[in-house]
Amino acid sequence: LHLHEVPDLPWSTVATDIFEWHCQHYLVVVDSYSGWFEIDLLKDLTSATVIKKLKRHFSVHGAPHTLISDNGRQFTSQRFKDFASQWDFRHVTSSPEYPQSNGLAERAVRSAKQLMEKSH
């Protein structure tokens, strides 16, 4: 298990995950420095849709040095690899045998679901 170091600057390392809530899919993006997270509703689960949402976050906060995700097909596609190269960030995936190694995003998903449940 590789533990991720706390970065020196906000939004230099972000973790992301996709979750389902009430039959809809959402993308969570969490800043490793502060723990701040943001959520987007996804119209579908394609790499193109995930990339579009990430570009919006990057246009506000700047592109990260490192993005951590699971091994979902949205993140392992050639299109996503090209996106990482074009936007010049390092993409790190969690271990396929141990997806909990993306714990920061997993915790943000739990918090997001709790907040959404309270506001529902």
Residue ranges and their predicted role:
Residues 1-114:
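Retroviral integrase
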Residues 115-120:
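Short, solvent-exposed helix-loop connector elements
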